[in-house]
Amino acid sequence: MFKKVGKFLAALAAILTLAYILAVYPQVALVVVGACYLAAVCACVWSIVNW
């Protein structure tokens, strides 16, 4: 129960932080989002390859 709440709060904090960065530093946020997207795509491809 507490682990789920902790994960939810961590995700919420990450989203709020990202939103704040997006509002204050748009260029930096775009780079960060692009890097995260690239990492997610790589992880998906890696999991498919190693299925």
Swiss-Prot record:
- Name it: Protein 1.4
Signal sequence span is 1-23
Arranged from A to Z, the UniProt key words for this protein are:
Host membrane, Membrane, Signal, Transmembrane, Transmembrane helix
Note the topology in the membrane.
Answer: Single-pass membrane protein
- Compartment(s) of residence: Host membrane
Report the GO terms under cellular component: host cell membrane; membrane
Q: Where are the transmembrane segments?
A: 28-48
Q: A Pfam family matched by this chain, by name?
A: DUF5464
